[in-house]
Amino acid sequence: MKKVLILGAGGMAGHMVYYYLDSLQKYRLYTVCHKTSLTGHSFILDIHDTNTLTNILVDTQPDVIVNCIGVLIKGSQKSIKDAVYINAYYPHLLSDFIGKNVKSSKLIHISTDCVFSGNKGNYTFDDKKDALDVYGMTKNLGEVINGRDLTIRTSIIGPELKKNGEGLFHWLFSNRTAQELNGYTKSVWSGVTTLELAKTIDFAITTDLIGLQQLSNNKQITKYELLKLITATFNLPVEIKPVDGVISDKSIVSSISDYTVPSYSVMLQDLHNFMSKNKKLYTQYEETL
């Protein structure tokens, strides 16, 4: 049974990775959180405390460390210092510490399509990472590319455990009683649900996937179409109004040839089913499940 250590286990991606992998009952899981324990026995870590990080790695000796820690767009705008340390520097620190303290282990790090400007779309490995904002540039610098570790470049949507999430999914549900919301028809997306990311991580562990990999279903969808699909899947009463909005296309071409990402409708229905089975986690969304 492989041992997996999940950093940032209380976040949007981290909690889903934990609960999905736990449901498979084939891993011994350890979780690391910033302030509040996810499971009652999580390690609590200030990421500036490298001594505690070393102790956690030495004590658990995980086969895989999944890094779900990150400063998002708003946080990056608020604190460039935090964005540089957490998004750019910390993934490389983790990779270095793993090599020094854990035998035969690897890092799985989550990157973003926001390393691209969104001026072109259908981005591949050959395209220049041309983002000019703090978030995009720091995530660019944080991509760990070597012969041992794995960086998954993607974009995610999914539920939050906290009340003040900033993702698109949480924004929609937080405003579900509004009469109407704007959906951007000129903003193109090609990401996955957090549940699908968790499934991909299971695949990556099983197949020992390494290097830099891009994750998508190779299908483009506008933010307007995506919001419409979410409202239909979760039976939300709000009307989505089509507006041009922000012009951006950060769609990426998937590179994981042996793994098939399903359609958006299937991903969202799978997410709905997962959330319905785990209502205790998602009390703020409960009426929609």
Predicted regions and their residues:
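Mid/C-terminal beta-alpha module of Rossmann-like enzyme folds, strongest
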Residues: 198-249, 280-287
